[in-house]
Amino acid sequence: AELVFEDCVVPKENLLGPLGKGFKVAMSSLDVGRLGIAAQALGIAQGAFDQTVDYMKQRKQFGRSLNKFQALAFEMANMKTEIDAARFVLYNAANRRDRGLPSTVEAAQAKLKCSEVASYVVDKAVQFHGGYGYIKDYPVERMYRDQKITEIYEGTSEVMKMVISGDIFK
């Protein structure tokens, strides 16, 4: 569908912002949306991590719980470190936004980092759950599906990289 407005006049009291600044207002709303998506991705990552910690403590393999296997435990350490790093990136961007500072690049960084961390963590969570991670009886299956959209809407990861690199090379 397409909307066409010809000779359309908007009364001054109905303007959403200063005349001629609509693009800037629209872009500013993207920053807030991207922070929300970053928070969603971070929540998904944290939830998948928490589910996996509980599962690994309970699940026995070769006579011991999964959390006793060093390779798996080390991967969980990496997952936690990535989640914490993503949280700091998100909190920094949100703090800048709250203080009225420019936050377009930081919001893009937060969305990129949090969505990529969610992808990594949820993928490992499903893997560590084995076949159970793929069935609807376990929450990580839903988290696996829910995570993917965080890399797409309000700008794909590639668009976030364009925003960030554009700032680097301006």
Residue ranges and their predicted role:
Residues E2-C8, K12, P18-K21, V25-K170:
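Alpha-helical interface subdomain recognition
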